[in-house]
Amino acid sequence: MIIKNAKVFTDGCRFVEKDLMIRDGRIVFGATPQENEEVLDAKGSYALPGLVDIHFHGAVGHDFCDADEAGLQAIADFEASKGVLAICPATMTFSEEILNGIMDVAAAHKNEHGADLVGINMEGPYISPKKVGAQNPKYVMAANADMFRRLQARSGGLIKLVDVAPEEPGNMDFIKECHDEVRISIAHTCTDYDTAKEAFAAGATHMTHLYNAMPGITHRAPGPIIAALEEGAEVELITDNVHIHPAVVRFTFNTFGDDHVILIADS
């Protein structure tokens, strides 16, 4: 396929109108056109690779935690219609019993159309009761490796990210024990700089919605954000101009580098 007159993002950080081709499922430039090849006129529309959202909760009136296949399919279809072709929806802070139902639906999902369900982001319940945000404090608990493994088995191995507040009793041990089985993210936390550094040394590699639901930066208490920067962590940003000021978004890209920043919807 040839896509003509598309706005393409270039190395100069600008959109430039040009033609591109699809070969073996990949975008290429400068390939030789084939005889009778399908041609699509983008008419100045943007042409981008399919996006991946690793942290959102639902769409079009459906929540991933509803544990409903029809709702999950509606979410997947909507995400694909907006250019998000792979999704890793997030669970909320719930009991193991409720989480079991969510994992069952995810494991049974067929990915026949819409965005592919490529993982689950387990945002709770191993968080700080002092930084619950929109989570339900009733279900906050200490991180439990056995519980995580039961949920992982139930999901068919779909859990790719687990959020942990490392300062809570027992949670550092969870990081040490499970970091080889799943990616660990520091989140919904009151942790200080030293504890965050310890968590990264123990195996955490990620920070959930940087700046939100965590201590900020001061010159005498650098907190988890500076620890994440020093340790080269991957960090999420909610770039809706509400959760974070645009200047802070620019600051984060300039300090962490674009290869460490992950834009999320958290919708």
Tell where the protein language model's regions lie, with residue ranges:
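Histidine-rich, glycine-flanked metal-binding segment
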Residues: 1-48
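Divalent metal-coordination and catalytic microenvironments
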Residues: 6, 25, 44, 55, ...
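Divalent metal-dependent hydrolysis catalytic cores, especially in the metallo-beta-lactamase
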Residues: 57, 73-101, 115-128, 155-167, ...
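Active-site-adjacent C-terminal substructures of enzyme catalytic domains
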Residues: 195-267
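Di-metal (Zn2+ and/or Mg2+/Mn2+) metal-binding site signature of metallo-dependent hydrolases
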Residues: 45-67
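Residue-level marker for buried hydrophobic side chains located in beta-strands
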Residues: 50-52, 185, 261-264
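Active-site glycine- and acidic-residue-rich loops that bind
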Residues: 95-101, 167-169, 185-189, 238-255
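Divalent metal-binding pocket/active-site signature
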Residues: 122, 129-145, 149-223
